[in-house]
Amino acid sequence: MAPGEIIGPNVTRLRVDRELSQAVLAERAGISRISLGKIERGETIPRAKTLFALARALRASAADLVTPVEPLSRVRFRAARRVNSREQILAETSAWLSAYSWLEKELGQERHFKLQDLVGSSAAPAELAARAREGLGVGPREPVRDICGLLEDNGLKMLLLEKASDLFFGLSVGPADGGPALVVNTWERISVERWIFTAVHELGHILMHLDAFDRRQTDENVDEERQADRFASHFLMPEGVFEDEWRESGGLSFVERVFKVKRIFRVSYKTVLYRLRESGRMGSDVFAIFQAQYKRLAGRTLKKVDEPQALAEGEFRFNWSSAAELGDSLSKYDFVEDRLSRLVREALEKEVISLGRAAEILALPMTEMRELAGTWVQ
């Protein structure tokens, strides 16, 4: 591949991701818009000075501009609306997956996907969720405490990306491209409960819809999304246990009851409401009823990104006087992938990779990589 065919698409992809027009990027890099256009089309190869200027303007490294991106083909990345950073997310996923797979092979730590026998199953989402829990060693009444650790220990690779977008929650990659792998958007404005749900939702796609993984497909398939939602809901809240908890909390107000059950299963309040509607316990107006009762108690309605704090364990009353200070009921430490970091540490200690390569794989500046390595203990 000619240099221009690598640099041009990389510059364009990063520019779109940074939401910069050609005119703005050209001005920041000190070149004309016409020159930038030629670079992006691959008609001109920028000189070193221009290359570094473009990298600075794009908040990237020169290596980011000259390194070819291995395209993913068997990937599911769909959204109801266009995600401008789509190509950059796919590029970052490709680079991460390539490094991850290489490390596993070099260290002899490749893992078999424990749920491979369930891929392509025709079972209903709820039944498949029960079988998946069993296959991962999760008891029928056991809550899922560490979803990242559970999935990574059983052969799934996980990448946590922080993208300032409420249009992108996650994607999944098939085995043909180095997967199965999941990518979850851990932007701070998305609740931890949503991160957890997204991970299991994408697992559902891998088990049920792998034959539909196609990079070229960008529009959501409503039926497949609903199936993945049902799978995630029943994986995190098995119906039998949910029924018991819902019945036992029957003396609480509707809102308090939802919050208590939400806290037990570590899911969003919306997941509980969907289950109530799906199971026929309540009708299609369940969300309107919840919002109306919440407003009477808290003095405000919940916005799209709000995830109110649930009742503390063993608590039967909610402190409505502090409702304005509600935050996520789970912290970011409830959703941490750490297998790649462990592989990087082992590779460093065995001198398989350099500190610079370790920083590159973990997407850390060298100073932060040195600090991290300095904190490692036995």
Briefly describe each language-model feature range.
Residues 1-378:
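Active-site hotspot residues in diverse enzymes, especially metal/ion-binding acidic/histidine motifs
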